[in-house]
């Protein structure tokens, strides 16, 4: 392939405007401080644990009794050690799943750990272990409650806010509140008071992210670990309503007709074409949620379905390495521990993540590029076997790069394209499976929304 480096963001910019009023509108959208923190700590572990763990089921019925919760103790310190070994920086615990059983001694229901043989408060034990181990702690609270009698009536919103208040005021710093949109087909048509929930969280835990059915983090659209070719953080604001309102939502006249059906499973969420048809835009990064096992809750029948360390590392590269965050579910067993198979796979995953950056060739903090920097050369001190290139944009100035390439300078002096991609965003990890001996790399920004701003680029062998 004959290189053509003259066509770049400083010249043709992919045939689209580098700067105009629309581009300025796009790049005015930037993350809040808690979203910047998320970009710096993009890998958490989900802990599905509760009544379903005791019964070895995926979904309960709401008809369980407190006697069905037969788990008497947990080892949260082991959970924390396992999560840290994997390279994750936080835990999100299912404090109440759809069955309505509460892992803390809630004052508002008897269907709680306080009326079981379990000794203590599970939420407190886990949150304390996270604090001691230097991990973030987040809470999952299911809006759908199959047990609570007030569900489906306005009184349920009071009940839900009371429980939310308990979780947000008794367990230290909460990094994230995770709202699930799932509910059964035969459930009464009941509208949750989302605005009230959000206001309560902003008041009691102002730094907490509100995820999935919330305004801060969006669902990637599947639970299989798949991401889009171009995963944008700047998207139409309407997308934040898609998960919680579904087809019942009313659309404003300011939204174009083609945007009315936009949802988190669409392939194109943030291209210029999509953004041009949206009146309001938000910073709304994608989260990849996937389980280490076949199911979300532990079951001994699924002990042989644990994903290998190699597969988990591949999921990391495809999520964190593709401008997303990763929420990997690791369900504790009915003995209150992470199963040895899960722990072994997670340890191997963490080793692979750390090994990726153990041997840097060079790293640079670039900042905003200059008008003459259509491409930038990075020269090595000698021939190195390049295995990874890791790039990050300065997201506090929005997401700008729309197309880029990496070209390696081979020992014979010839240039070889080693990667052609679109977005960079929070992080882009380019992996050369077999490695490539080279003297350096040329970064070519082909297309951008205004001047590219590259926070860092690193080359690793």
Language-model region placement:
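Mature catalytic domains of secreted/periplasmic carbohydrate-active enzymes
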Residues: 2-434, 444-460
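Exposed beta-strand face motif in extracellular beta-rich ectodomains
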Residues: 437-441
């Amino acid at each position: 392939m004959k290189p053509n480096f003259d066509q770049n963001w400083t010249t043709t910019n992919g045939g689209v405007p580098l700067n105009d009023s629309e581009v300025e509108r796009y790049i005015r959208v930037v993350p809040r401080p808690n979203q910047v923190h998320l970009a710096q700590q993009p890998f958490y572990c989900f802990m599905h644990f509760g009544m379903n763990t005791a019964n070895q089921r995926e979904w309960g019925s709401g008809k369980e009794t407190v006697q069905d919760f037969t788990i008497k103790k947990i080892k949260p310190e082991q959970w924390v050690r396992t999560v840290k070994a994997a390279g994750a920086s936080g835990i999100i615990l299912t404090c109440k799943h759809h069955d309505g059983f509460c892992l803390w001694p809630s004052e508002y229901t008897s269907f709680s750990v306080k009326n079981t043989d379990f000794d203590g408060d599970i939420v407190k034990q886990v949150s304390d272990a996270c604090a001691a181990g230097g991990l973030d702690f987040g809470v999952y609270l299911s809006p759908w409650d199959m047990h609570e009698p007030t569900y489906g009536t306005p009184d349920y919103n009071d009940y839900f806010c009371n429980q939310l208040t308990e979780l947000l005021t008794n367990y230290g710093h909460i990094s994230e509140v995770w709202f699930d949109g799932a509910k059964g087909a035969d459930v009464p048509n009941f509208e949750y008071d989302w605005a009230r929930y959000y206001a309560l969280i902003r008041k009691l835990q102002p730094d907490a992210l509100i995820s999935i059915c919330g305004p801060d983090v969006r669902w990637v659209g599947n639970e299989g670990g798949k991401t889009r070719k171009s995963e944008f953080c700047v998207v139409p604001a309407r997308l934040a309503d898609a998960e919680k309102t579904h087809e019942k939502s009313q659309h404003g006249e300011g939204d174009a007709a083609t945007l009315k059906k936009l949802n988190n499973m669409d392939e194109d969420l943030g291209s210029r074409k999509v953004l041009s048809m949206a009146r309001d835009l938000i910073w709304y990064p994608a989260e990849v949620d996937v389980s280490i096992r076949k199911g979300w809750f532990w079951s001994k029948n699924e002990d042989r379905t644990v994903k290998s360390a190699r597969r988990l590392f591949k999921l990391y590269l495809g999520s964190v390495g593709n401008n997303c965050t990763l929420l990997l579910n690791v369900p504790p067993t009915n003995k209150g521990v992470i199963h040895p198979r899960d722990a072994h796979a997670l340890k191997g995953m963490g080793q692979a993540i750390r090994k990726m950056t153990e041997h840097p060739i060079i790293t640079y903090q670039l900042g905003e590029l200059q008008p003459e920097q259509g491409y930038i050369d990075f020269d090595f001190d000698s021939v190195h076997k390049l295995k990874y290139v890791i790039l990050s944009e300065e997201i506090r100035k929005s997401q700008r790069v729309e197309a880029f390439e990496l070209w390696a300078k081979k020992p014979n002096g010839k240039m070889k394209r080693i990667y052609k991609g679109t977005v960079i965003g929070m992080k882009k990890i380019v992996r050369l499976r077999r490695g490539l001996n080279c003297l350096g790399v040329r970064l070519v920004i082909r297309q951008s929304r205004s001047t590219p701003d590259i926070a860092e680029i690193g080359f690793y062998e």
